[in-house]
């Protein structure tokens, strides 16, 4: 099994090109099922989860071709409506096939999902919303079995809690429903906006995009389109934090500053000079050690949970004491014991991590426990004396495209080893 070997070096410096957003690409790939003509997606990152999504679509009978960052989907021959356990167990986003299959074909059997081990992430919001639209659903033998006679019906859905995945599933289902669907307390994440914009390009009628109330007037058919996936804001944030921790200066190209305002504000609080353009972000620490910051995760536009682990590392090496409070997922501090093995001074109190900054960490063999935690360990290794060996990096490969190559391009000593 591959590992990453990391050695400390100087400050990161240079330019990194940001990949397309995994969390936008996955739902948009599933939306290809809704199209009655070929659908072309560009700026798609080369990731394990993307490959799994393509396998799932092929398993249903769709024709999928991958050419670099371009994926073409022809769903006209879909004749199979089961998303099997073998594929779904490795990727939570597989649940997003449920809405499109049910809306277009009236039937879907989807295995209960797997993916990152960071808490329950219940699917009941997805199921309850689809039931309000007329679906008959039972969970049996590890599968969600959903059926509808004719088309789904428009409904007024109030979501008990903000859920990105449930918003996306219901948005896709409503696009082909009969009548008007209103989703209240909808997620406002940029990736939800990207999916909605893609659906509009396919012929969907959606208003309120980017707000907490989405109104979808169902249409009888959706067509394929050419669509470019938004830049990955979490990858962007990860490289910016790595540069801040190493007291460096970097430029992120193919980035979207408007999707990262809460993160950029915290980096400025930490002492970084930030400059932005339409599609680039520059960070310069001027050789200074970052200052500790206080973080509280919450749904967009507040601070993203997917950047929490990276800021834990920033605080580990910062001047002063900072607190990180996690409000989205339980069990999302699994990186803390690994960082403590490297010499971090941290303590957990419920959903809050109190971090006292130290000058340097010590290299150690550590284990990645989930996608973003593994990125935090790589950043820690860049400021640790000796060698850091990160095990279980298949988590990293699920969400970061060629991460070691990109770090090497910035001067980081990060090497993949067997």
Curated annotation (Swiss-Prot):
GO terms for biological process: cell division; cell wall organization; peptidoglycan biosynthetic process; regulation of cell shape; UDP-N-acetylgalactosamine biosynthetic process. Belongs to the EPSP synthase family. MurA subfamily. Its EC number is 2.5.1.7. PANTHER family: UDP-N-ACETYLGLUCOSAMINE 1-CARBOXYVINYLTRANSFERASE. Signal peptide: none annotated. Cell wall formation. Adds enolpyruvyl to UDP-N-acetylglucosamine. Phosphoenolpyruvate binds at residues 22-23. Pathway: Cell wall biogenesis; peptidoglycan biosynthesis. The gene is murA. InterPro entries: Enolpyruvate_Tfrase_dom, Enolpyruvate_Tfrase_sf, MurA_subfamily, RNA3'P_cycl/enolpyr_Trfase_a/b, UDP_GlcNAc_COvinyl_MurA. It catalyses: phosphoenolpyruvate + UDP-N-acetyl-alpha-D-glucosamine = UDP-N-acetyl-3-O-(1-carboxyvinyl)-alpha-D-glucosamine + phosphate. Keywords: Cell cycle, Cell division, Cell shape, Cell wall biogenesis/degradation, Cytoplasm, Peptidoglycan synthesis, Pyruvate, Transferase. This is UDP-N-acetylglucosamine 1-carboxyvinyltransferase. UDP-N-acetyl-alpha-D-glucosamine binds at residues 92, 306, 328. The lineage of its organism: Bacteria, Pseudomonadati, Pseudomonadota, Gammaproteobacteria, Alteromonadales. It comes from the Bacteria. The active site is at 116 (proton donor). One of its GO terms (cellular component) is cytoplasm. It comes from Shewanella amazonensis (strain ATCC BAA-1098 / SB2B). The modification 2-(S-cysteinyl)pyruvic acid O-phosphothioketal is found at residue 116. It is found in: Cytoplasm. One of its GO terms (molecular function) is UDP-N-acetylglucosamine 1-carboxyvinyltransferase activity.
């Amino acid at each position: 099994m591959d590992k990453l070997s990391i050695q400390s070096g100087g400050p990161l410096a240079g330019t990194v090109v940001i990949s397309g957003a995994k969390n936008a690409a996955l739902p948009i790939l599933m939306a290809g099922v809704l199209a009655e003509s070929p659908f072309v997606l560009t700026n798609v990152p080369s990731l394990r989860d993307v490959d799994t999504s393509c396998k799932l679509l092929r398993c249903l009978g769709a024709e999928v071709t991958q050419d670099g960052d371009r994926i073409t989907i022809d769903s006209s021959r879909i004749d199979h409506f089961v998303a099997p356990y073998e594929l779904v167990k490795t990727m939570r986003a597989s649940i997003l096939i449920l809405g499109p299959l049910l809306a277009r074909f009236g039937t879907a059997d989807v295995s209960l999902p797997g993916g990152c081990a960071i808490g329950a992430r219940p699917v009941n919001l997805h199921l309850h919303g689809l039931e309000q639209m007329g679906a008959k659903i039972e969970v049996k033998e590890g599968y969600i079995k959903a059926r509808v006679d004719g088309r789904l019906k428009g409904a007024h859905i109030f979501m008990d809690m903000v859920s990105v995945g449930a918003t996306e599933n219901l948005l896709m289902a409503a696009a082909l429903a009969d009548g008007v669907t209103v989703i209240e307390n909808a997620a406002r994440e940029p990736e939800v906006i990207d999916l909605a914009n893609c659906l509009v390009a396919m012929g969907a009628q959606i208003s309120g995009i980017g707000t907490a109330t989405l109104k979808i007037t169902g249409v009888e058919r959706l067509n394929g389109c050419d669509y470019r996936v938004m830049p990955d804001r979490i990858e962007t944030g990860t490289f910016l934090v790595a540069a801040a921790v190493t007291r460096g200066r970097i430029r992120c190209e193919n980035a979207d500053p408007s999707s990262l305002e809460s993160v950029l504000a915290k980096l400025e609080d930490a002492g970084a000079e930030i400059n932005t353009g339409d599609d680039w972000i520059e960070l310069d620490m001027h050789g200074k050690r970052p200052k500790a910051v206080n973080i509280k995760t919450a749904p967009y536009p507040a601070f993203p949970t997917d950047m929490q682990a990276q800021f834990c590392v920033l605080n580990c090496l910062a001047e002063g004491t900072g607190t990180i409070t996690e409000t989205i997922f339980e069990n999302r501090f699994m990186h803390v014991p690994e960082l403590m093995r490297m010499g971090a001074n941290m303590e957990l109190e419920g959903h809050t991590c109190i971090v006292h900054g130290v000058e340097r960490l010590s290299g150690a063999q550590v284990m990645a426990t989930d996608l973003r935690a593994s990125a935090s360990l790589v950043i820690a290794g860049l400021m640790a004396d000796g060698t850091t060996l990160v095990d279980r990096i298949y988590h990293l490969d699920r969400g970061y495209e060629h991460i070691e190559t990109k770090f090497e391009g910035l001067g980081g000593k990060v090497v993949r080893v067997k």
